[in-house]
Amino acid sequence: MSKTAQKRLLKELQQLIKDSPPGIVAGPKSENNIFIWDCLIQGPPDTPYADGVFNAKLEFPKDYPLSPPKLTFTPSILHPNIYPNGEVCISILHSPGDDPNMYELAEERWSPVQSVEKILLSVMSMLSEPNIESGANIDACILWRDNRPEFERQVKLSILKSLGF
């Protein structure tokens, strides 16, 4: 277990506890493992996700912050940049050099100066503004592009279902 990663994660946790961005709650799943965090992300206003609060899991590699964490929504949500298994696909979570399709600028990808807060804010931004040019869920991309009302209806239904309705 990397002491550098542990120290960095504890520092980031303290910062989030002290000054968490609105609509975001995050922290370690247990006291015994600082490398797996649970997150709650409130859907941004004026989006199909506005009425939802979404569970996600952040998994940090042992060499964090040299390598990016993985963020997965549990359960998955319908979104062009979220794989059907719930894994989020955005630039900030991609290692430098991880761009086979040449869609991303190097400065958009992961670097050790990024933080948990920046990741979660980027995910909130992604919920507001999907990037269908670099989609992870092709069906969601097509629905977003070709039938926005149906896309929004399906998102709202999934929110109601997640709330037990």
Swiss-Prot record:
There is a cross-link at residue 89 (Glycyl cysteine thioester (Cys-Gly) (interchain with G-Cter in ubiquitin)). GO terms for cellular component: CUE1-UBC7 ubiquitin-conjugating enzyme complex; Doa10p ubiquitin ligase complex; endoplasmic reticulum; endoplasmic reticulum membrane; Hrd1p ubiquitin ligase ERAD-L complex. Changing residue 81 to A: Impairs degradation of UBC7-substrates, but does not prevent protein degradation. The keyword Kinase does not apply. The keyword Acetylation does not apply. This is Ubiquitin-conjugating enzyme E2 7. Induction: By cadmium. Pathway: Protein modification; protein ubiquitination. Present with 2100 molecules/cell in log phase SD medium. Belongs to the ubiquitin-conjugating enzyme family. Signal peptide: none annotated. Catalyzes the covalent attachment of ubiquitin to other proteins. Functions in degradation of misfolded or regulated proteins localized in the endoplasmic reticulum (ER) lumen or membrane via the ubiquitin-proteasome system. It comes from Saccharomyces cerevisiae (strain ATCC 204508 / S288c) (Baker's yeast). It is a peripheral membrane protein. It is an enzyme of class 2 (transferase). Keywords: ATP-binding, Cadmium, Cadmium resistance, Endoplasmic reticulum, Membrane, Nucleotide-binding, Thioester bond, Transferase, Ubl conjugation, Ubl conjugation pathway. The lineage of its organism: Eukaryota, Fungi, Dikarya, Ascomycota, Saccharomycotina. Pfam families: UQ_con.
